[in-house]
Amino acid sequence: MTQWYPASPALWQGRDDSIEAPDARRLFQTVTRSETFSPENWQQKIALMGFACDEGVKRNAGRPGAAGAPDALRKALANMASHQGHERLVDLGNWVAPTPDLEGAQQALRDAVSRCLRAGMRTLVLGGGHETAFGHGAGVLDAFAQESVGIINLDAHLDLRQTDRATSGTPFRQLAQLCDAQSRAFHYACFGVSRAANTQALWREAQWRNVTVVEDLDCHDALAQMAQFIDKVDKIYLTIDLDVLPVWEMPAVSAPAALGVPLIQVLRLIEPVCRSGKLQAADLVEFNPRFDDDGAAARVAARLGWQIAHWWR
């Protein structure tokens, strides 16, 4: 059974510059850490949650280790300067998945996300492998059952695989099937896709599902496509697989990208999403601290989370 644990206070430590000025604060000083999972107490705040699971990565024959990412990313966030928006972050702990019960873990995350959103919070989830996306996305769909939900994925992979069980490569096929079962439209856009990393069968599935696909080669000029997708939906779930970044910026993932989309381009793409007023949920997935020898990759990933919280409207 998937267990919930509050985040350790030892994770939220950093340099104290408060002697300089009242507003010389860092995230470890402004993030609220909750000892209970009680989203009803935190309306209008951003629920920061960890999904400590890489069972889907293992099933997908990837490099395990992403289960350790949530706490590693908290440590990287802790010492970053606190600016507008960061005071809204409430750390609602980690969902820890026992091997091999991926399906139970995804259901626990789904229920937690739905509860947060129904309580008036927004969710920022630190994965975990990209199996995080099915639990997170399903929770968003549950919370906004009467509205159109757009899924924006920044990823080298379409993650529309067809297998006999859930993996880190199947979350968007699972979400598409969930939409089918609920007789609702499946709105999915994937930016940063590597044609070299996706078979023709996956491209055919994306075409059949009317997925908006922007290749890694074209992301430098994709703001119009992003704006068009934002305009056609009521609510947005943003998921960032860190393997969308080039290997020289993000080596610490299961499948590093030979080409990838540079961090500055990723930030330019997500800014209008964050400022749209439609973003309800976001996550960072696939970070693997086992392959981050000096902590530099954690800081890259944390900067994305920092920027999302800062821009979120």
Curated annotation (Swiss-Prot):
| Residues that coordinate or bind Mn(2+) 1 | H130, D155, D159, D241
Task: For this UniProt record, give its keywords in alphabetical order, as a comma-separated list.
Answer: Histidine metabolism, Hydrolase, Manganese, Metal-binding
KW Metal-binding (keyword) present? yes
Q: What EC identifiers does the entry list?
A: 3.5.3.8
Q: Which residues form a coiled coil?
A: none
- Residues given in the record as Mn(2+) 2 binding sites: D155, H157, D241, D243
Single GO molecular function: manganese ion binding
What cofactor is this protein dependent on?
Answer: Mn(2+)
Q: In which pathway does it act?
A: Amino-acid degradation; L-histidine degradation into L-glutamate; L-glutamate from N-formimidoyl-L-glutamate (hydrolase route): step 1/1
Q: Which reaction does it catalyse?
A: N-formimidoyl-L-glutamate + H2O = formamide + L-glutamate
Q: Which family does the record claim for this protein?
A: Belongs to the arginase family.
Q: What does this protein do?
A: Catalyzes the conversion of N-formimidoyl-L-glutamate to L-glutamate and formamide.
Q: What is this protein called?
A: Formimidoylglutamase
Source species: Salmonella agona (strain SL483)
